[in-house]
Amino acid sequence: METNYYHPRELEEAAALLEEQEGTVLVNGGSDIILSISAGKITPTGIIDIRGIKSMNTITDDGQYVHIGGNVTYRQMQDSPVCGRIGGLARAAGSVGSPVIRMVATPAGNIATAAPSADCASMMLALDTELVLVSVRGERIVRQKDIYLGAYKTDIQSNEIIKEMRFPSPGPDKGSGYARFSRRKSQDIAKVIAGAVVTVDKKGRCLSAVISLGALNATAVLAPSIGERIKGLGRDEAIQLALKFFPREAGLRESYFKRYKEETTCNAIAEALDMAFAETERGDLCYACGSL
């Protein structure tokens, strides 16, 4: 079967093609979709390559939101001064695959794929990320936490494109942290993922904490049960609590790695929290507006 290839230069053109050409799929990084095509899991009639849409290839902070375009790669995130000021996000971006994969893979693609073990998607969940979705009918803004319907299933419609991801610009009273545990040291799919975003008062005590967990159940999830428990605690107290408290939201599935996940989940949360608190203690955290 012949597969048509489209290479739009504008977002509106891509949205029109997606609406008009039945059976087509989008490709930006392609690290997930190309594997599915090669394995015969999907047989599209057409491929819409949106990598040439330059308006979706920027990272900016306007003081209200950090904006990450739908075509931005993990390598771009690693090199971005904007992402570099958000320690948990920078660490998550650098944890994805290998250097070669990070040059092409995108967080937008991983969010859309909804793999349970997607590194950066789990961290972005803790940052309260919103997706700006575009179709021929206009824009729709939806919170990342609301799109997941199950493993590899989302509420993103077949005619919608992730124009950008955005989350609130962090201030000097906020810190972020990220941890992943796997059996091998490199290029292994994460078995446990934890993201943390904390807001502290002038004495370094926790005012609020958002914890995200990935690779433990069908989708990445938030864990408010632990976030509520560490309110009012300082760094050391919060870490000690995290090491002892297993969040109910983890909901571990039966799997070969279940015992490993039971033994390491609390450690991952504690590590992410430690990094987040440490980020608030550094005096150089002025999240100035910037761009890639």
Model-derived regions: residue spans:
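C-terminal structural segment of proteins
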Residues: 1-274
